[in-house]
Amino acid sequence: MKFVFVVHSEHYTARVMQLFDAAGIDYYTRWDQAQGKGHGTEPHLGRGSYSSTNSVMMIAFQDEAPLEALIRAIMAANAEIKRAADRIRLFQLPLERMV
């Protein structure tokens, strides 16, 4: 089992939801207006010069197939996003148990 966080600019929320649909994923938890700064990116603080914010999607996968489909879809979407700092990020961790 795997645990995934998908982090993206809120500008790309509709696109990320399309990627989820295409991968057959209709289960997630989403946090909007997340603030922070990634490696090599500008801050997303929701105010001032850094008025943009991120969304964070959390997904628990029991099966690898939809996760692999999502990874492929994100890689393809990122190839179309010109600025590397704007790309959709996916962080994968092992998941020991779901109750």
Protein language model features and the residues they cover:
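Positively charged, small/polar-rich N-terminal and surface patches that mediate targeting and assembly
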Residues: 1-99
